[in-house]
Amino acid sequence: MQPWRRKFPLFETGVTMKQRKNSNLSIFVVVFSVFLFGIFMYNEDVKSIAEFPFSTSKPHDVHDEATPITEITTLPVQESIKNSDPIQESIKNADSVQDSVKDVAEPVQEEVSKTEEVKKIELFAATEDEEDVELPPEECDLFTGEWVFDNETHPLYKEDQCEFLTAQVTCMRNGRRDSLYQNWRWQPRDCSLPKFKAKLLLEKLRNKRMMFVGDSLNRNQWESMVCLVQSVVPPGRKSLNKTGSLSVFRVEDYNATVEFYWAPFLVESNSDDPNMHSILNRIIMPESIEKHGVNWKGVDFLVFNTYIWWMNTFAMKVLRGSFDKGDTEYEEIERPVAYRRVMRTWGDWVERNIDPLRTTVFFASMSPLHIKSLDWENPDGIKCALETTPILNMSMPFSVGTDYRLFSVAENVTHSLNVPVYFLNITKLSEYRKDAHTSVHTIRQGKMLTPEQQADPNTYADCIHWCLPGLPDTWNEFLYTRIISRS
């Protein structure tokens, strides 16, 4: 008789004391035991295998996969059955055995599926190379340098590969035909910016919050940062939610958020509604910041700005009283005076609420406008429309109308605080980028410009905001450099 060459069904519906059937049964026991221990070794997390009725070894005997299998296969057939009372009893009820196998197999399969999913995520995120990042010297001035054309490393991401960009900044999708504005890299004079690595930044943001606070230019920079980090995050592991003034981009696998909070003047104003804020008669409360500030507490990286909303009038309207009380009377004061009051209020809030051991604070200087082409000696230009290259003559004196009085206030206040604030001096280097604005390739009042409007850049060109990918990516390279250098 050669029972090992015969094939038997996995489960028998009856058992007799005849030698042939006993042999068949023992073979079933051996095969099934091997199967179970195979499962055990495939996923060591399933600890219940050692106590399963079909195991002939006691739990303390199971050290490796060879031991129990050898003991079973070398025993005589009769002895195997004789010494395995749990097996003999279990086989009397084949349905019970089948249910037991199902109970073990399903958790194993589920665990394997989870493991494979984790491996897929890790594999997706591991596409970046692991070369070391060379940091610039601490004393290097990152903001003095020149724009260098570089179509090998820039742009840092593709417009059509970032689903989170709004129609306001997707210039190529909106009909812009030239793309050279995406290929300019900022080169500091005395050092170099480190290669941008999204995974490295995300590691620094693990279990942390980064928040941009301010106006639509800070929102411009926030969208850039979202696109920079999301490129290494697999689908389904990232999300964007907007609630009131707060927009939150979340990266699940790092438990990290990149957020934007709408507060165009930092302090309370009648322009604080995140949806209905296009108000020409702008009124502020320079000493009132707590309503906004409560949303900034506990954030690990704060990036503030306020500028563009100050520029529609020469004097600022300051409320006498409170919006909550329905007061409407105001006084008008000079722009720099009002700006200084707001910056002092902001500085006081920083010193009262920021723990420098936990939170890093940045303040971004003014993002410039390019309204008059004569500013860069182009008499045939129309605002920033049709500009395709930066101002490359770095020694040429020019002015695009930036209010440097506000720049001085912001710089002085940030440097005078007891809490460290890193001043992002983006103004001058951005003034060279007349080519990088959204111009007529954008939306207005929530709607895409019509062909007729696009043909009238003198009226409709947006020379305030920036295309993405584009200049705000460089601003974020400064943030990235500071964060990875200090943490």
UniProtKB/Swiss-Prot annotation:
Null allele phenotype: Strong constitutive freezing tolerance. Altered vascular apparatus morphology, and reduced xylan acetylation and secondary wall thickening. Reduced rosette-leaf growth and inflorescence size.
Effect of G145R: In esk1-1; increased freezing tolerance
Enzyme class of the recorded protein, top EC level: transferase
Effect of substituting N220A: No effect on transferase activity
Biological process annotations from GO: positive regulation of DNA-templated transcription; response to cold; response to freezing; xylan biosynthetic process
Keyword RNA-binding: no
Protein name stated in the entry: Xylan O-acetyltransferase 1
Chain's gene name: ESK1
